[in-house]
Each structure stands twice: as C-alpha cells, then as structure tokens.
Curated annotation (Swiss-Prot):
Homology family: Belongs to the G-protein coupled receptor 1 family. Adrenergic receptor subfamily. ADRA2B sub-subfamily.
Record Pfam families: 7tm_1
PROSITE patterns (UniProt xref): G_PROTEIN_RECEP_F1_1, G_PROTEIN_RECEP_F1_2
Polar residues bias spans: 291-305
Keywords, alphabetical: Cell membrane, Disulfide bond, G-protein coupled receptor, Membrane, Receptor, Transducer, Transmembrane, Transmembrane helix
Protein name listed in UniProt: Alpha-2B adrenergic receptor
Superkingdom to which the source organism belongs: Eukaryota
UniProt source species: Didelphis virginiana (North American opossum)
An example Gene Ontology CC term for this record: cell surface
Recorded name of the encoding gene: ADRA2B
Length: 382
C-alpha cells in the first residue's frame, strides 16, 4: 500500500511540474522574468521525484541499502541538494514578491531575466554548499550486526544543526516575516483611496468624504461660457456673468441681442452653433457636466460624479467630484474586506503547507542532535 501511494505521488509530481515548465515556456502571458523561479523550482521537484524518492522508498522497504556504495555517496549529496534548493526557491520567490510590492517602480525596472537568473544561480549555490559535507564526510555507511549495508547522512551534531538551519529553519523564518510584511503593505494600500489618500469611511471627515465639491479653477469670464454644454443642456441665453436671467431659460441658445431674429435665421444660427459644439467635442472628447457655482442654477442641471477636467477650444476648467471625493460606499468596503480575506487565505495556505510538509522531519532530525540519548524519536515515527 505504501509503495502504491508513493509511486502515485512520484508520477503526480513529475506530471504536474512538467506542465508548469511547459506552460511557462510556451505561453506568452507567462514569460515574465519572475516566472523563471517557477521553472527552476519545478525542475528541482522533478529531480527529487526521479532521483531521490524511488531509492528512498526502496531503502525503507528493504531495510538496507541495496545499491552500490558509490551511488550512496552521490545519493546523499543529491538528496540534500535538491531538497534544499526547493526550499530556498520558495524563500527567493517570497523575497521577489516583497521587493515588487515595497519597491514597485525601482525593482520592476531592474527585474530582468539576467537578474532573475543570477538569483536562481545563487539559490543553487547555497544548496550546493550545504550538500557538500555528505561528499566530504561519508557518513555512516557501515553494516548492521546482520551484515547488511546502510546508507545514512552524517550524524555529527554540528552538521545536523547547520544543515537544518540552512535548509529549513532560516528560509522558513524569512518566508514568514516577508509574507507578513507583504500582507501588512497590501492591507494598508487596499484601505487607501485613489492617489494614496485615505479611503472614504476610514476617518476622513472632510468635504470630499461628505460628498462635497472641490474648488473650480478661476478662469476669465470669457472662458466660462465655453463649458455651458453638459449632457445636452445648453446655457440659458439670457444669463449674464453675474447670474442674472434674461428671457425664457428654455428657449434655444441665442445671444440676447438676437432675440428678435426670425425663425429661419434662428434655426440657421442654432445649426452653426451645434456644428461648432460637435467640432469641439471631436477635438476635446465628450464634455462632462461642470459643477461651477455659476452653472448650479441652470434648469434641469444634474452634476456628474466622475468628471475632473473639461477641455474646450477656449480653455480648460477643472471639475469637481472626482473619484476620490465620493461618499461612503458600502460595496467598496465589502470588496476590500473580501480581498483581504482572500489574500490572507492564500498566504495561510502557502506557509501552512510548507511548514506542515517539512517541519516534522527537520524538527525530529534536529532533536536527535540536541539530545541523542533522551530525545530520540522512534524509528517508525521518523
């Protein structure tokens, strides 16, 4: 039963990691430099599944080392190399994510394939450095009283502790601290509004949070009439600069001194103005409704909540009620909370699975070096 389960895990590991490598190398959307970490990590896991696990399974089932003495030395070194490389890869990925979050502009410009390959090379060198002692110190490959050969790692306390710290405990501590820092940064930025300002409802009691309007830039009176068009509503023809109304506000947009023009002349004038408005819209984009105090009295005027700038042929006017000045929106708060929960769950899974898989082995392995007589873990549990 154990052999069947382990064999299935070997095949599943090879197949899954091969798909990861194939996806990154063939998909254009996955060819980002940071995905090279995944390729190298998948390669390390495939090597563990093909060169380490089968021989470990045979050694456990038979109870002795069936293969040659030379392969035992190579096997021990490769075991430490591939497992350490896999763990340190996870640590490097966490650091890469932290730098991309905390130093987005600076680090993303430096995140080149050459730089990522250099980090990957460093990871493999660290793993190789930790795996050298099994080749130098041959370990215990003697024979049991029954005369059967054994293949074990060096059981000296200094190597057990140093390899455990370098292969697991130090990378694990770095990962936990880094992902905790990433979570705090993401949580803070998620609760901030646009342009780095505090989101509505997080203590902001200014005019923007209460739905107030911002100040419109002061422009000459000759420019302000150019922003009279908003959502199909034109400025009343008889309105003066001071806000005084002249004539019927619902009449066509014509100057006061031409109020006596005949229907044909008036319609021709209106068509010319409409053509001029269309030309302005084509050059400057669709106009947004202004919120100037001089336009608040316009009949049927409903200010929009999205526009910030209205550009015309005669000038440019800053408009109020941008996205940062919206009132409290419950749906936005719910979205933020759901995003934080989802991000927390992902981090918990990543760290939890990593610790669950590796901590029992390294804890029991280190415990045998600290107190070999009184804290020895039973062989079956180990």
């Amino acid at each position: 039963a154990i052999a069947a389960v382990i064999t299935f895990l070997i095949l599943f590991t090879i197949f899954g990691n091969a798909l990861v490598i194939l996806a990154v190398l063939t998909s254009r959307s996955l060819r980002a430099p940071q995905n090279l970490f995944l390729v190298s990590l998948a390669a390390a896991d495939i090597l563990v599944a093909t060169l380490i696990i089968p021989f470990s399974l045979a050694n456990e089932l038979l109870g002795y080392w069936y293969f040659r003495h030379t392969w035992c030395e190579v096997y021990l070194a490769l075991d430490v190399l591939f497992c350490t490389s896999s763990i340190v890869h996870l640590c490097a990925i966490s650091l890469d994510r932290y730098w991309s979050v905390s130093r987005a502009l600076e680090y993303n410009s430096k995140r080149t394939p050459r730089r990522i390959k250099g980090i990957i090379l460093t990871v493999w060198l660290i793993a190789a450095f930790i795996s050298l002692p099994p080749l130098i110190y041959k370990g215990d490959k003697g024979k049991k009283p029954g005369g059967r050969p054994q293949c074990k790692l060096n059981e000296e306390a200094w190597y057990i502790l140093s390899s455990s710290i370098g292969s697991f405990f130090a990378p694990c501590l770095i990962m936990i601290l880094v992902y905790l820092r990433i979570y705090l940064i993401a949580k803070r930025r998620n609760r901030q509004g646009p342009h780095g300002k505090q989101a509505p409802g997080d203590g902001d009691t200014g005019p923007s949070a209460l739905g107030g309007t911002s100040t419109i830039s002061k422009l000459p009176p000759s420019i302000l009439p150019a922003v009279g068009e908003a959502n199909g509503h034109s400025k009343p023809p008889g309105e003066r600069e001071g806000g005084e109304q002249m004539g019927d506000p619902t009449s066509p947009s014509t100057p006061p001194n031409q109020s006596s023009v005949g229907p044909e002349d008036g319609s021709q004038k209106q068509e010319e103005e409409e053509e001029e408005e269309e030309e302005e819209e084509e050059e400057c984009g669709p106009p947004a409704p202004p919120t100037s105090s001089s336009l608040q009295g316009t009949p049927n005027f409903q200010p929009s909540q999205g526009s910030q700038v209205l550009a015309t042929l005669r000038g440019q006017v800053l408009l109020a009620r941008g996205p940062a000045s919206l009132g409290l929106q419950p749906w936005r708060r719910r979205t933020q909370m759901n995003r934080e929960k989802r991000f927390t769950f992902v981090l918990a899974v990543v760290i939890g699975v990593f610790v669950l898989c590796w901590f029992p082995f390294f804890f029991s392995y280190s415990l045998g070096a600290i107190c070999p007589q009184h804290c020895k873990v039973p062989h079956g549990l180990f």
